[in-house]
């Protein structure tokens, strides 16, 4: 309509369109938008269409004058037309809301609501009151006729109305109304009979109007005004009150009507005037009452609205106040954090000032009136004295560029920033600006995908190859056709022309990245094809090389030209074209730093915390114990102090120590041309580098830190308020502390390297260490367990091999120790957990495939353990962070009985002490809820090489987290297809381009998309199974290794190269971020070689494999228990467990061997361990018995064939066929598993090859008693047996003498070592004769005695034979007929004892303990020539100096006598083979021997200096023995390389050594060292540092040994010179005295 407004206001009642019908509604919200057409009244005149915003103060009506903005000025105009484009948000009566246009709304005006009353009068709300439809006449007559009819009816029946009842009154009124209507309607042709029913219906409808009209209006108004449920409730209450008021008013009106009708004095003329007057009065009263009710309603609504607004304002103020308080709190915390960080930065600046400089120094400004805070400035020295800094300029230069590149906290460059030029710095800044956006980094990363480190080369790709050929033909006109390399060498100036410029401006082209691969045509044509990546769509395109146009040919275009070319591209390609143009142009012009592009793409940009950070920053440093009582800030939450109990010493270290650490760290990085921020932050919280370094140092080296994966624990201690700070903390450690910790852990300091690398304490004589207590308790626990049948299920049995449901016995201490070892595993790797985790595992019959550590619910049964066991804590920690002794790993498997045994008293442990303690069993954890996940299991991302089988453990990715899962079905097997693709790729593979071809990548991607694995979540949703892609799965390292090796078993598996497998692995694991170290192609090549060689190792079977299986079957009839433990292990894991353990190997070699189920042998304490029922333990169990801390190998073993023997043993090396390895009857020899009958071969066999030998085993034996020690023969028997052997040897010198077959007792006692076995091979025999092996290091504790049994002259030497034996508490290496079985002493060299002369009486000896340490016997060198000749025929014992035969005889006689003084015939038989007498060489005399508890590196440490005797011995050569203290009072010595001596004088030895050294260079080959250059060339790169470290230690020991030997030689030389001088002086004195006596006698003789 013309009178409608331009737009509708809020609250306007309209008729809105809803589902095709118009319903009543009210406008609630308006989004105004008017389109106005105006005519300008001023220049430039005309008409224009503007928006309502352009008419700021206009009244939007037609023909209204206003001002419009045109060309930044106001012009007078007139509105011509208005078009409403607004959006109206309306609310209908029933509460529905909708947004409509103006065309869907209609105002409530006269056109639609003119007959308001008639519409309401229609009987639509009461259908029961009418039976026929309403006629049109009643609607047309209007309201006036209705009112007249009512007045007529009421006037004609005025007095009689009150006398009739309601029904009669209604009937009469209807009748009268019908009559009056008939009189009034003169035009109606109907009869009176026909009109009466019609009038009655009309009267009934009119009467219904009065009752329903008000109710309908109130309902409609209330529903339209009710916007919420609360308003509807208020409307109901108002409606109720109105109904009550209307009823009261209605009653009053009726009374008034009656009174007015009754008291009316006006004459009634047809009843019309009184009725009209009454109706007007009634109408006025009704109107007044309605107005009154309306006012009352408005007042109530206003009152309620005020209350609502007041409540809303109160709530709004409360929220605003809370928001302001929160902002103030955050601002306070933010300022505090910034102030603390700023203070730490200033502190770091002062810490960096640690070097001297000549030019620069730093100072703080004192301009307090300008700045409130001091600032550090850099100044240049003029006097060039007392300078402080060199690194400040470096620091400022680096911070400037890093700040520009936003790299101050999370990136580190290897560049020397102080040498960076301005152009280089700006190139870095330009590179960072270009790659600042995440979208740009993604695009550039996709363009460079597939390129390793090559220089990027760009080309131009045309939409049609004809366009490219046209421009190439134009440029190469008049010349020969060039190759692509020749085109790239053409300068731009040579081709610059308008034609070239217009070509690139008009044609369709796009930049592309060129790949270096070159492919020949499959059809056999001469052309070559290249691979390019389209920088618009990112696809790989294979094009002819002749059609490539170098990007350098593009001319320099202006900004307008570039914009025009960009506009020609499709809309979705414009942004990429612009970025590609910019990137390629800047890169070609060297405006970008090519070295930092990939670094920036690999960075994780971490945004600094803003003021809107919701996480409250908490100081990093934990509160110290002495500040616990102080008041803390309410804004700073105090972390849990239990997390810092173990690190209290690190937290509370003084500031001087931290400053010293920071200074050394900065100096270290400065030496490596790098600068660090000594106060790094994570999410606004500072990280204490000293704290992090100490935590990592306690764990071990960097490899152990990465393998332990304790970043979450470190983050809780360092930054407890930060969330998900593990990766950032790992980055900080890698950038700041990794190299520094590696240097300090491996090489350490020179003074530290001179100290013995052991964790043992110095044990004084009589002192008893904790490790001895523990070993004694362990052996006592074995002794107290009685032997039972293998198949019995007795609960008291420990380690029975035949029981199915045996239980493991553990204690609370072992549980705590196991938890600690999870965090600090020794020599752990990322591929497999350490051996300490599998040495003592728990069986779970229902989950046999999962071998885990001690379950969590084991702690619930601590009340079952003894009080002492639960109260005791493991306090013996490793003192050397880089290594861990074997004892600390063996301690993890200590049984409960050993822990529960009462601690013995200090001193030597008793032999036959037994403690009976009931063995406690911890209940199994079946049905106790979910077990804790084994955190040591390593997972890697699955790729196309993975082969997922049913039951494998997986990790599934859902949302933003990895969950535990299991494979319930085998994944799609595409092994053959993958194999074909890899073999096809090998045809194009070249060593110069180690990368996959694009076709192989596409084929492998297709295969990867086909592979699906059906998994079952165990950590997120356990109700459903799901088919998942390999990209969202992780598999274990062991399963991935098996999957790689399965390609070797295919028919063409031998053709597959490890390089191809490594390339595929690297391509699909390029984005693997789970590993701590960066993965290179060499890493993947190494694991590929291991995987492919794994199947070959399976094919190489051991010689005694069948016997091993037979032995195991006989000894373990029921192997279900062992299968329950190893059931979940793969074949590769079982093979890893069966690796041969080299005796004397390093820790790393030993830890790689996984131990099997350790079966503890039951030992009878009354009988020797000769029963056949005892189970044979694996080699790992035998080595596990080395519980002494001195058993830890110092260096990794060197192959014996590479190490020649000592130079003294090289000359006249005797035949090795006569030496037996059978050992003694008391101590069995070492041999293979199940091959006990092959013990008669000699020890130094030429065919012994340990590299192909199987696993070595040692049987576990019980405690040794005097009943088990064979009795030593008498000296006469010794001499007789020796003479017998010498005569036999002289008779058959060429033939080898074999010992008698071993007895049954010796078979069951000890199995031979690999070094004592032999194979028959002549070539190996000659090789061993050329380069005989040196002694294998026996890592045991106790006396190490070498028997030299030979018939050669005294200037020759034979091999040294060593036998290993077990005893309570430690292992020792002893020999046949040795009296020092249970004693400890230094290294002793002894030869066959000579028969003592019968005429020489033995000097008296003091009483000596049978099992005590060997005492040193004073020796003399003043012998007669006849005695020396006899010594050459029958050599005597050599102890550094020559000793008398009588002394040796007496010593042998005493030592070879048992406690009861008798010798058994079996002992005499054994002594016939090798009979020796021994004496000891003190540490100071030979400086060698086994390193023992408390000993030093070079011959042992002496806590008390030996006192020299008060008087000199009669024998001059006895001074050496007098200078030394008795070995009983000395501490053990360390193990060093011994220097054998000869049984001759010092001069003879000196002359022989001079003859040997003549004409020979002093190089490594003469020092018995292998060719180190050759070892370095053959060794992998990652092992070079370890080999150099080992060589350093070896050279140090050689130097120390030589120095010690030289000192001993000099001392002996001085002693002999002194003795010679004294002898000469005595002879001279005697001769002079004789001469004087002769002269005196001559003088006194009387003359005849």
From Swiss-Prot:
One MF annotation (Gene Ontology) recorded for this entry: transcription cis-regulatory region binding
Q: Which domain of life is it from?
A: Eukaryota
What spans are recorded as compositionally biased (Acidic residues)?
Answer: 166-193, 219-228, 251-260, 848-860, 1102-1112, 1145-1154
Q: Where is this region: Disordered?
A: 150-270, 284-307, 763-935, 1095-1563, 1628-1648
The Gene Ontology biological process terms listed for this entry are: defense response to other organism; ERAD pathway; proteasomal protein catabolic process; regulation of DNA-templated transcription; regulation of transcription by RNA polymerase II; response to endoplasmic reticulum stress
Residue stretches of biased makeup (Low complexity): 1165-1185, 1377-1392, 1474-1486, 1531-1541
Any Gene Ontology CC annotation: transcription repressor complex
Which stretches are tagged as biased composition: Polar residues? 261-270, 1213-1251, 1348-1357, 1542-1551
Q: What is its main location?
A: nucleus
Composition bias of kind Pro residues appears in 1195-1208, 1393-1404
Q: Which Gene3D superfamilies match?
A: 2.30.30.140, ARID DNA-binding domain
Question: Which Pfam families does the annotation name?
Answer: ARID
Which SMART domains does its entry note?
ARID, BRIGHT
Q: Where in the cell is it found?
A: Nucleus
Listed Basic and acidic residues bias regions? 861-878, 925-935, 1313-1326
Domain ARID as annotated: residue spans = 655-745
Where are its TM segments located?
none
- Say what the protein does: DNA-binding protein which modulates activity of several transcription factors. Plays a role in the modulation of endoplasmic reticulum (ER) homeostasis during chemical and pathogen stress, including exposure to the Gram-negative bacterium P.aeruginosa.
Protein's recorded name: AT-rich interactive domain-containing protein arid-1
Q: Which organism is it from?
A: Caenorhabditis elegans
Q: Which gene encodes it?
A: arid-1
